Each structure stands twice: as C-alpha cells, then as structure tokens.
Amino acid sequence: MFYTENYDVIVIGGGHAGTEAALATARMKLKTLLLTHNIDTLGQMSCNPAIGGIGKGHLVKEIDAMGGLMATAADKAGIQFRTLNSSKGPAVRATRAQADRVLYRQVVRIALENQPNLDIFQQEVTDIILEKDSIAGVETKMGLKFRAKSVVLTAGTFLAGKIHIGLENYAGGRAGDPASVNLAKKLRDLNLRVNRLKTGTPPRIDARTINFDILAKQYGDEKLPVFSFMGSVEQHPEQIPCYITHTNDQTHDVIRKNLDRSPMYTGVIEGIGPRYCPSIEDKVIRFSDRNSHQIYLEPEGLTSNEVYPNGISTSLPFDVQMKIVNSMKGLEKARIVKPGYAIEYDYFDPRDLKPTLETKAISGLFFAGQINGTTGYEEAAAQGLLAGINAGLFVQEKESWFPRRDQAYIGVLVDDLCTVGTKEPYRVFTSRAEYRLLLREDNADIRLTSIARELGLIDDIRWARFNQKMENIELERQRLRSIWLHPRSEYLNEANEILKSPLVREVNGEDLLRRPEINYQILTALTPFKPAMEDKEAVEQVEIAIKYQGYIEHQQEEIERQKRHENTAIPANFDYKNISGLSNEVCAKLEQYRPISIGQASRISGITPAAISILLVNLKKQGMLKRGE
C-alpha cells in the first residue's frame, strides 16, 4: 500500500546520525520524512551520557559550524563541562560535556518537531524499494510504502542486533528495543559487503546505594566552555560533580575466575569490539601487570538516580557483574538497576561507499553512523550531517560535497572509512589528522560556515554573527599592525616592565604578541594598545593566528604540495589491468577499492608512489587527466 505523500528524502533511524541527516535536508528546504521505530527515543544516548572529548569535540564543533544540532543539545543538557588538554596547544584542546540524558533527548525532539519541511513517523522499516539500481522508497512493518528520491539509512546497532549477557543472548537493537531483523535480511541481498561488529555498555548503578562520602570528586572547569558558536554559558543547566573509584585485586580475581562464562572469551561473540573502549574483561587480561583501573561514576542526569560507571563495560553474567561492582570502594552496597551487556550487529564495509556516503551499488542510497563501522555519537552525527547534505544535493541534481582531510575532521573520518575501511569500530582522534594545527575546535566555523551557507544550511542570524566575528578579527589585526613602539617611545618603560628583553628596535602590536611572555590580555593592558576587543572568540583567533603564524603557513604550504594531484579524478570504469608497470597486487587493490581520485588511491595500503606515478602517466595518455576543484 503506497502512502499518498511522496518525499524528497527519507531518513531511517532517529539516533544521532538520523537526526542530523533529517535536520540537514529539511534546512535545505527539501521535503523530508524521518522514520523511527519509537518517537520517544529520538536522540537517545544509548551508552555513555557524554558528548565530546579528544577528536570528538572537534567533530561536534564542525557539526555546529555547519548548522547541526549536537553542540546546542550538549550546551542545553550538559551537567559538567571540561576542556581537555587545556595546558597544551590549541590543536589538541577539546571540549567534553557530561550530559543529562533526558534533557538531551528533549532538546533533540523539540528541534525535530519544530523544523519546517520535516515530518516524523513512527514505524519500523522492513524493506527498501528499488527500481533497477536506484532507490525509490521504503516499506514499513505495517505495509506502508513511502516514495523518495533518496534515502539515508542510519540503523545504528539495530541491524540483526544480538544482545549478550553471559552465555545467554537474544535479539535486540539495544536494551529495551527490538532488533531490525527483516531489514537486515533484505540489505544482505544487496551487492554490499556485510560483517559483524560488537560494542558494549556497563551496568547502571542506583546512586542511593553508593557511598559518595569516601570517593574523590571530579568537578568541571570553573570557566565553563560552550560547544556551539551560537551558545552561551547561561544555557547550561545546574553543574554537578562526577566521582572516582578504582578496580582492585578482588575485582580482577572475580573477572579471571569467570572468564569461562564470558561470551567474548568462550567464542560466543564473533564481532570485534572497540579498541579504545575495551570491556573490563579485556582490560584485566590485556593489562595483567596493572592491579587497578580508574572508574568514573558519572550521573545520568539531574532527575535520575542512575549512575554510569565509565570503565567497566561488560558482558559477564549478572551475578558476576554484581560481584565486580560490590568489590570497589564506595560500591560495597551498590545495587545494579540495569545490567551491562554486549551487542553484536551488522555493519557494511565503508569501502563500498563514495566519500559522499552514497553507496556505490545503489544510486540515491546513503549510509551513516555505526552501520559504516564507526563508534560514538559524534562520529555518527558527523556522518549523518554529511549524508543528509549529499542526499539533498542528489535530489536537487547538484554537485556533491565532502570535506578534504585538510579541511575538517569530518573529512578525515570519511576518507579513512572509504579509502582504508575498518575491521573494528572506528573512532576519531586528533592523531588521525595530518594537519591538526589547521583543524582546531576554535576555527571550525572559519573553515566550514561559509560552505554551509552556500549549501543552504545556515540561517541569517548565524550568518550575521559569523560575518561580524570575521570582521572583528580583521579589524583587530589591522589595529595591532598599525600601532608601533620604538626605543624612543614615551611608553617604552611601561612595555619593558613586562618584556623579558627590552625593546631595541621598532615593533608593532603583532610583533609583541608573538613573544612567548605576552598574551592578548597583557598586550591590551599597555596604554598604546588599549582598549581590548570584547569579542572573545575573535580575540582567540587573533592570538592563535599571530602566535602560530609560522607553523600555520608551513602546514598550508605542505597542503598545497599535496593538493597538486589530490583531487585528480579517476574514472569509475578505469581499467587497471591494462596498465603496464603495475604489479598484480597493486592492480588487485585498485580494482577492489575503486578510488575516485589520485589522493584517495595514494592512501590505500600497499599503493606505492611509483604506482601513483604510473597511474598519472596513463591517465594523461588516455586524455583523462582532469584535476578536480
């Protein structure tokens, strides 16, 4: 039965990827339908109640710079904010927020329900409708069929999801939600490579049964950060502390004695888990020399008694989970309200995707989130945004867009996935980016907001504020460059009091700011450089741009060298087998990965610089050497 209404874009799934995808296409003024199995779980934080962190915070800022929701939701739901690596350079500083699950979900739902051009419908999707090799719509469990020109699939851990607690297991998408079994079967019939991954979550503990008095407190920063470039500290709810406990020899003994009841160590679970978020079983076995692991007790909200013990993700049986919890300081009498579990689920090899996140096999079908082999809310949201943008551009028959590696962490993420693929849950780190100094949290808007405006993602209010900031940066730099101090200046003594070495030549404000002992606040306290600018975001950009100018210019020169052939396109039907000089191994890899550009080909493991040179020569010979923009 076809539903009478047709859509431009249909988004399947209401998690972090799905919500960003749906909001993006709706902001592009396209008629969008978001299908979810449960409207009440839109924006659900299924695992840890936190947003951001190293690399992840950078993604959140980039999503916000392009008009996405995640940063605003975190600002309005964050109950503890911290700036990680605050003593280090600006490239690796990262914002993290402990979030109230209920508040976060409320912010997401309000945004979705008030977004023009967006309809929400509660129904499980059981099939996709194809016409030849193109998407045409979807079918739901009750037989409703919705037509659309493009579809974004963001099924999370629901595709053939299987939950494990001890040696018992059952079908489920997450605790309390059914798995998407029929859709998983249908998708396995497509020309896409499918495999299994695993993730896990710890038991939740009743706060009323924890002895907080004997535990160390961890407070957020006194100077509270914000995620959104449009956000303010006033948006934050009440701030509360987390607490710290530790595993001990007793904890580890309990785990070792019960490994024969672990689905991971008895071969029941075959999917590979996240390397950077291992289960407590894994930590005890892999780091056998350690007799203790730090565990953070994170409140799940201002109105909830549930506490998330970050660091003891487990799939051991419930009775063992109780012993693990009760073995730790402050938790001797603690009660579990939700057991921990592991979940196995289907994911698709992301090498079968274009960098736009459109599947190579089916025109108009886009994948985003954990089904592409990633882990984390932020990685999912970033993919959802990108998939939504490109689904919208596809419908409008416009040229697709995706960021370069030197342009955004979103670009690093999709390039890693689509070029190299992954066999374990992938997460973003700053160490994955070659040009970290250019991809800072603080300049995400400078990198991406103009592009987002062209794509139709940015409203007039945000655009005006962004332009005002850019103008403030330029005016302040001009002002500092125009003010000079010389050895005969009447302000010389005032300046020399704060300088490590006295002035012996004429300098301007930018020259002074480059000195390590001078920051913007100190500089603008000097009489000739008063008054300081009030726009704190612009001040930060001025100071970083001046202090790191040499390093930034060096990275930009390196990027220009790399870009010479980065975007040189390789035709989709290019015949590698007829190129003399390429080894069989190189040919096989190029045939398997089907890179869309020379840059992407160069990042495939085993593809040598010599092979790239041969490719370029042959592209030129065949008249195909067209450099992308």
Curated annotation (Swiss-Prot):
List the InterPro entries: FAD/NAD-bd_sf (IPR036188), GIDA_C_N (IPR049312), MnmG (IPR004416), MnmG-rel (IPR002218), MnmG-rel_CS (IPR020595), MnmG_C (IPR026904), MnmG_C_subdom (IPR047001), MnmG_C_subdom_sf (IPR044920)
The UniProt GO MF terms for this protein read: flavin adenine dinucleotide binding
Could you mention a single GO BP entry for this protein? tRNA methylation
Compartment annotation: Cytoplasm
Cite the Pfam families for this sequence. Answer: GIDA, GIDA_C_1st, SAM_GIDA_C
- The residues that hold NAD(+) are 273-287
Per the entry, what this protein does is: NAD-binding protein involved in the addition of a carboxymethylaminomethyl (cmnm) group at the wobble position (U34) of certain tRNAs, forming tRNA-cmnm(5)s(2)U34.
HAMAP family linked to this entry: MnmG_GidA
Q: Which family is it part of?
A: Belongs to the MnmG family.
Which PANTHER family does this entry report, sorted A to Z? GLUCOSE INHIBITED DIVISION PROTEIN A (PTHR11806), PROTEIN MTO1 HOMOLOG, MITOCHONDRIAL (PTHR11806:SF0)
Full protein name: tRNA uridine 5-carboxymethylaminomethyl modification enzyme MnmG
Q: What is the phylogenetic placement of the source species in the record?
A: Bacteria, Pseudomonadati, Pseudomonadota, Gammaproteobacteria, Pasteurellales
Q: Which gene encodes it?
A: mnmG
